[in-house]
Amino acid sequence: MSDATSIKHPSGLTSGDFTAAEEPFALFAEWFAEASGSEPNDPNAMALATVDPDGLPDVRMVLMKGYDSHGFVFYSHIASQKGRELAANPKAALLFHWKSLRRQVRVRGAVTPVSDAEADAYFATRSKQSQIGAWASKQSQPLESRFAFEQAIAGVAAKHLIGAVPRPPGWSGWRVTPARFEFWHDRPFRLHDRIEFRRDTPDHPWTKTRLYP
């Protein structure tokens, strides 16, 4: 725990005074860069929370595939449970947890689909086997057996022995545009540091508040 609390940020701040940060995306970039060097698996993994039509929450782990000042991007099947829930209620919460650094970041905001061009560009970077799997999978639908899935994969693979695999029309991405960030850092005796950034719209400035642990 003492090692984690002595980390230096590129900005010159230490983990103990990260609360001096004034812009959440820059702070996230610093923390994510450090997590990318310390997390043993998937530093871009994030919990994605959505709400179903009955108001019941659903949460699952997904991989962040990009971020910038406009938000955080992930991809999946449009007809999946998450896709259907986001279509009905385009709001979500994210959680990044980096155990190696004793840190987490929470995000909440509105969700919008990425453009076809953006989805096409990302899909083209996936391995061919992953591209084929996206065509074969009917994500979140009942599956008779693993063998049936493997047969579907083989059928798609046979159609794409040569050449590029196009993006399935039912597979795309979403962008979560933050209205709220919360940065949490572990401290001894549970006297943790927490700061929150809020804004009413993407055009408004951020308001920062320090929170009790």
From Swiss-Prot:
Oxidoreductase as UniProt keyword: yes
Cofactor requirement: FMN
Cofactor note: Binds 1 FMN per subunit.
Positions of disulphide bridges: none
GO biological process: pyridoxine biosynthetic process
Binding site for substrate: K65, Y122, R126, S130, R190, L191, H192
Pathway assigned to this chain's UniProt record: Cofactor metabolism; pyridoxal 5'-phosphate salvage; pyridoxal 5'-phosphate from pyridoxamine 5'-phosphate: step 1/1; Cofactor metabolism; pyridoxal 5'-phosphate salvage; pyridoxal 5'-phosphate from pyridoxine 5'-phosphate: step 1/1
Keywords assigned by UniProt, alphabetized: Flavoprotein, FMN, Oxidoreductase, Pyridoxine biosynthesis
Family annotation (SUPFAM superfamilies): FMN-binding split barrel
GO molecular function, one term: pyridoxamine phosphate oxidase activity
Catalysed transformations (reactions): pyridoxamine 5'-phosphate + O2 + H2O = pyridoxal 5'-phosphate + H2O2 + NH4(+); pyridoxine 5'-phosphate + O2 = pyridoxal 5'-phosphate + H2O2
EC number: 1.4.3.5
Residues binding FMN, per UniProt: R60, M61, V62, L63, M64, K65, Y75, S76, K82, Q104, Q139, S140, W184, R194
Role this protein plays: Catalyzes the oxidation of either pyridoxine 5'-phosphate (PNP) or pyridoxamine 5'-phosphate (PMP) into pyridoxal 5'-phosphate (PLP).
Family that this chain belongs to: Belongs to the pyridoxamine 5'-phosphate oxidase family.
Subunit structure and binding partners: Homodimer.
Full protein name: Pyridoxine/pyridoxamine 5'-phosphate oxidase
